[in-house]
Amino acid sequence: MDPVDPEVPPWHHPGSQPQIPCNNCYCKRCCYHCYVCFVRKGLGISYGRKKRGRPAAASHPDHKDPVPKQSPTITKRKQERQEEQEEEVEKKAGPGGYPRRKGSCHCCTRTSEQ
C-alpha cells in the first residue's frame, strides 16, 4: 500500500472517492455506487429539511363545494387509453416484461460491460 501524505485530509486520499460522480438515477447499480448513494437512494435517508403541507383553510370558498362526479364516458375513454398504452409497453418489452436491451440503464450512460 502506498504511503499517504498525513497533511492531506482523509476525503482527499486516493481511492476515497468514486471515479464516476454521483447522479440522480435510482437503478440498482447507481444505488450501490458509493456509501453516500447507498444511504440516500438505497436506504432513503436524507437529513434535509422536511416539507410539511399546511392544512387547508376551512373558510376558503373552494373547499366547501364537493367534487362533481365524472361522466362514465370520460372514465371509459381513460380506461381505453390506458389499455392502449399498456399494450404498447408490452410490445416494446421482451419476454417477461423486461426491456430487450440487456445490461443498460435508461437513465445513466453506463452499461454492464463497464
UniProtKB/Swiss-Prot annotation:
According to the UniProt record, list the residues that bear N6-acetyllysine.
K28, K50, K51
Segment Transactivation: which positions? 1-48
Task: Give the location of motif Nuclear localization signal, RNA-binding (TAR), and protein transduction in residue numbers.
Answer: 49-56
What Pfam families does the database record attribute to this sequence?
Answer: Tat
* Alphabetized GO MF terms: actinin binding; cyclin binding; metal ion binding; protein domain specific binding; protein serine/threonine phosphatase inhibitor activity; RNA-binding transcription regulator activity; trans-activation response element binding
GO CC annotation terms, alphabetical: extracellular region; host cell cytoplasm; host cell nucleolus
Q: Which family does this protein fall into?
A: Belongs to the lentiviruses Tat family.
The further comment given in this record reads: HIV-1 lineages are divided in three main groups, M (for Major), O (for Outlier), and N (for New, or Non-M, Non-O). The vast majority of strains found worldwide belong to the group M. Group O seems to be endemic to and largely confined to Cameroon and neighboring countries in West Central Africa, where these viruses represent a small minority of HIV-1 strains. The group N is represented by a limited number of isolates from Cameroonian persons. The group M is further subdivided in 9 clades or subtypes (A to D, F to H, J and K).
Name by which UniProt lists this protein: Protein Tat
Q: Which organism is it from?
A: Human immunodeficiency virus type 1 group O (isolate ANT70)
